[in-house]
């Protein structure tokens, strides 16, 4: 039987999926996507496919991948989707199709408990207060029962717990086969399973870490793959940029100092100079950290900052101390395997520092971020099209890129150009939802000018009656932290509804609370614009404060704008609009998640109707009914 008939049978009314998966119903769009994926796998070709919400794209790419049975990598944008795929979707479809191959889940090492670090922390004590000590005892208890060491499974631990960085290894600090705990290592075990599996679920960060630096032990995965499927593919260009660049972080430097001190105190007690030099470096790193932000999150241009004499002086002192540390370690080389591996890290940091001082190299953005507690110095390529495009050419495999948000104004040009994708089959599959019936899009009249000082209160005044008429059940998605905090404060002052604010607890807990407290309002920013799935009555109103253009002074964007201009392009139309369109599509996509959902999206930005480019945004959004009258919005919400 050819693959098309096989796929048609799987997705038919009486097929394997209908018979084995509760609630499965055949969808024309899903079948069309499954055919396209199957064809790409058979021909070892590239496919770029946008599948609107409700298409059922996960099964549409999983079924053909399992049918062909080739070595497959599936890469997701978020760890949430990665876990959902591995723990929910894959077991269901594997059982339905009676697939007997091996499947594996692989994350980056920062997700796994490091037993060597755990031993060190138990021996030396944790960094932090009593609450961190309590977290440690939770981890020790969990370690007795876990088979994977994946922190996601430790449900008693918050995802942003301060204990996690103390208990995970980094590529630099990992001792590899020299580690006394290597035989029980969770990272090594996960990688071994991945290498032996027929289908591996990874995330984009891990995929590009491997592609860019060939981190030892994982380098064999991509070369063996015959099918590579990227879900949430709209995130790829930005993630790829991070990995084809260079970064030096305060964590790398603090970890280095800590590890040197451990060697001095345990293995080389006679090397007092080692401890002294490490302590001096630690002090220099702490001082340098304070120059890059003092509490608030700061991102800026490293080239510009490096011209300031105080920063340059502090940076040169950092280089000097690293050079001296290298000389001190040389005196003890061969006496400790741990110190030998630390020496390699120091040499690598020396190279990174040298590159960060060579700020005149073109084609890269030099930028920094800091908040008083930690910092990062980065060199990011302005384009990854040549590097990624070369990988596509060199590797004979099926490359499949899918997301609900890839096209802008009816084409994939922006996405394909950023990744150097050529000669790919391109397809747009529209959502099967009845948007004109299920949803209403409103750009209200009489909106305050976005530049006015009183915007916040005026906006709150306009929106609160609608939110209260809907009894909450609302996401307010903001484009800045100041607007997010300001609106939350306004609603808390003026309304009796439960107002939840991003950052006050973890993302998972906020969503849980939002669904449980039926009359609540969640005010959030970037991380809630995508990857959040709330179905049914719990969410029937999504408010977006303005079009999500990235601030033009954001260092990476600024560098790309300058580069585009130098090449004779139009940065606003070529870069800023396409990226804002994709972000807006993600935000709007939070509303209608199922055939029975109904609700309203309010976008508080006149530019959608007053500027020519507004049409590009509107064309890319679902074809909801439209109004500018908030009374009609209230009517629609009350007639649900």
UniProtKB/Swiss-Prot annotation:
Residues 458-634 form the Helicase C-terminal domain. Belongs to the helicase family. DinG subfamily. A motif (DEAH box) lies at residues 125-128, 231-234. Residues 16-278 form the Helicase ATP-binding domain. Probably a 5'-3' DNA helicase. Gene3D superfamilies: P-loop containing nucleotide triphosphate hydrolases. Binds 1 [4Fe-4S] cluster. GO terms for biological process: DNA repair. Keywords: ATP-binding, DNA-binding, Helicase, Hydrolase, Iron, Iron-sulfur, Isomerase, Metal-binding, Nucleotide-binding. Disulfide bonds: none annotated. Its EC number is 5.6.2.3. It comes from the Bacteria. It catalyses: Couples ATP hydrolysis with the unwinding of duplex DNA at the replication fork by translocating in the 5'-3' direction. This creates two antiparallel DNA single strands (ssDNA). The leading ssDNA polymer is the template for DNA polymerase III holoenzyme which synthesizes a continuous strand; ATP + H2O = ADP + phosphate + H(+). It is an enzyme of class 5 (isomerase). This is ATP-dependent DNA helicase YoaA. Pfam families: DEAD_2 (PF06733), Helicase_C_2 (PF13307). SUPFAM superfamilies: P-loop containing nucleoside triphosphate hydrolases. Transmembrane segments: none annotated. The lineage of its organism: Bacteria, Pseudomonadati, Pseudomonadota, Gammaproteobacteria, Pasteurellales. ATP binds at residues 51-58. Its cofactor is [4Fe-4S] cluster. GO terms for molecular function: ATP binding; ATP hydrolysis activity; DNA binding; DNA helicase activity; iron-sulfur cluster binding; metal ion binding. [4Fe-4S] cluster binds at residues 114, 174, 179, 185.
